[in-house]
Amino acid sequence: MPTEATVAKFRPYTPDEIEAISEQLYSAYGDVQGRLLKTMARGDITSWRKAFTSQQLAQVERMLDDLNATTAFWTETHVPDLYKRGLWTADGYLQPGGLSKFAHPGEWTPMDLGMARMHDEAVRLLAENVALPLQEANSYCAQRIGDMVARAQKMAELAGKGRTIPAGLTELDYLRDTAEGQVQLRIRDASLRSMQQAFAQGMTRQEASRAFVGELQRRGVPCFIDRAGREWNMETYSSMVSRTVAHEAQRHGLQNRMVEIGEDLVEVIPHTRFKDSCDEYEGKLLSITGKSVGQTVGRRKVVASVDHARATSHLFGPNCTHSAVPYIVD
């Protein structure tokens, strides 16, 4: 077993260290979100001519393309490093001197090659877990902005014809009962509703435009809708994705190395960032494969498998900052 000094050298990244790594990506999304909002606020959105609108939307597309490149760079730089940190942490606990070794030193066996492929595949999949969701979110964001601009202009056109919502009618009543309103029936976005309300209150096109952009600034640029129907803005969604995958990369590196070596038990490290539903597993022993669940090891019980703990609590789920280390019986 390695010395205490060796183990300390190969400790997992702390939640604060992983947060700093994640922030390198999500801060870029926050910056672009601010630039997008400034682009939307420039001029009167309700009276943009087609050429000017195309110019603005082209700027939006360029910003989002740059974000895709930033995401790719962050992924290529940090995901392999985080995964290796997990490997090295396992080595520090399980290998003499913290050095990795294969089952058959001095030669490559089919098993060794298989494990090497497993590590490469794990890193590839983890990288996709960052790149694909954020690329899809950026694409959704571009489509949503274009859609909001088109709807805002249509709303201004209707208002210009004197088509305001009569007193006593709800927005939905008006949309359902007027031919022009059918075009706007699917408008449920709060920023567009703020513009619609502004027109209903007799505000000018410029005032309604400012209301629209102001509400958009308050809510952030939408880029993702989850299964519960909640809308995420660019910065909050990218921070969740980057933070979650950063923790996953380190954890999978550690667990895969342990499987490679033939070890099965991990201990969940407590953290002090905030209280969460997964705190019940702090300091508890978990089985990577599930084969050790219920066993008593070194006077401590293995309470669950890693998969069961994830399924029944928030442990190792989105935004969870817990980590695990190998459990060694002296």
Predicted regions and their residues:
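Acidic, glycine-rich two-metal-ion catalytic cores of nucleic acid-processing enzymes
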Residues: 223-224, 232-330
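Electropositive, gly/pro-rich neighborhoods at or near active sites that engage anionic ligands
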Residues: 227
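N-terminal leader/targeting and assembly helices and adjacent pre-domain segments
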Residues: 1-224, 328-330
